[in-house]
Amino acid sequence: MKKQRPINDCDGSAVSVRALAASAGIQFEDLQADVYRLRDKLGPDRKKAYDESIRRMARGGAVSETEERALLELGKRGFAVGSDAEFEKFRSYARALHKRMMLDPCASPVALAMVGVIANHAVPSPTKRGPRGRLMAKASQHPVRDILLGVAGGAFGGLRMSGWNPIGGVVGGVVGGIVAGIKALC
């Protein structure tokens, strides 16, 4: 008799994420390794890793000083999220920031993509019933923290791998957000 394996929704998404990364000349495994290398260097503190990624992007010229401050403030608010109500406030703040940045003709595409991914991410509630909700309820922190770090680390890694080409940062940030979102669900 053939064994039944449970269906894992997370396996199919990786193919399209890899294709997106490859379209910008980024090797998915290298991007993932770069994010993990930064995490290992800075330790388990996700906020510290997020802040360092943003600062390095600003030092490299991928984001302006104003955008650096806005992204650091976004991270400060995001890492303070602990409930669904706080997440909704955070998401409305991120969406308002994204709208303001879209109106600014000088906004960097990297910062715009990062804020856009964060503002439009749907994070499932860790308190909802069901297998995913139960798994997430075991985690003590809100999954938006993983998404913030995934977007920042992915953008930084994409910039480094593409020779600081903004397209690499945009794709890296989007891919990092997707990977973090998938991992939050699985």
Where are the regions a protein language model picked out?
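Membrane-active amphipathic alpha-helices enriched in small hydrophobic residues
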Residues: 140-186
